[in-house]
Amino acid sequence: MPEYSPIPNNISVLLSMLALMCSTVSAQELVPRAYWPTPNGTNILVLGYQKTTGDIVTDPSLPLTGVDSDIDYLQLSYQRTFSLAGRTATMQLSLPYSRGYTEGLLEGEIRGRHTSGLGDARVRLSYNIKGAPSMDAKGFQALRADPKTIVGVSLLVQAPTGDYEVDKVINVGTNRWSIKPAIGVIWPMRPTWLLEFEVGAWFFGDNGDFLGETREQDPILSTEIHLVKRIRPGFWASLDANFYMGGRTSVGDSEQANLQRSSRFGATVVLPFKGRHAFRGSLSTGLVTKTGGDFEMLSLSYLYAW
């Protein structure tokens, strides 16, 4: 049986998964440090806020054009690290709430709606298959001092728990199941520099109650790359970029001309304080946009770890 060592007060041991717990916008998200491990038995609670403005809706594949939105998100997340077959594994639960106004064109007609309510809940399981055996705080400090190449896999499941009205185009929830399997690699370039890469794919269930018809969506291939600078224990910053393609939808027998092919660029900073607390901030913008994705995002989060 693995030994569960007490978690030390040093926040550097507890912050490495913060960025993972703060994003709410499916394939368009930027998530640095998604596969960096924490010691066995670590718990993290995060309260996150996001502000998005521009061509964005809760479900980016909706058949809307000329979208202009102003949406605020709150998200509560809990995460625990544990040992699975002698390797580091992490389970994360997230529940978002959003409120905002969205306006766009649907078949040449302007549609606008104020929305508020709970979004779709998420569960994510990640597992490190190389470079991150289950470890106590002492082992984690050794990994920080001499980083190794880390390879991890993950599965994210998004459940149709959000508020959804069958007679509305614009909703908070998506009324369908979604899953995203992914694989990620962390390469240490120097002791304080890390290069991270992830490739994954979103797969979507059907929405059988889309204005009286069934709405289907093709998978979306997504990639992310992050350059991370560790400034001091627990204090780090990153430059983030992604690219995603696919996701064409069909409603009934009609295929939509809404293939997504876009990329985003942003930056993230995490600053610890008073031992077990931290703040996180990030900004991102559309770099190349086709069929949505041209929006600005500000994210602020508070973290408590034990």
Predicted regions and their residues:
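Residues that define the transmembrane beta-barrel architecture of outer-membrane proteins
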Residues: 41, 68-74, 116-123, 149, ...
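Transmembrane beta-strands of outer-membrane beta-barrel pores
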Residues: 49-55, 80, 95-101, 129, ...
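Surface-exposed strand-loop-strand hairpins of Gram-negative outer-membrane beta-barrel proteins
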Residues: 52-73, 110-111, 166-171
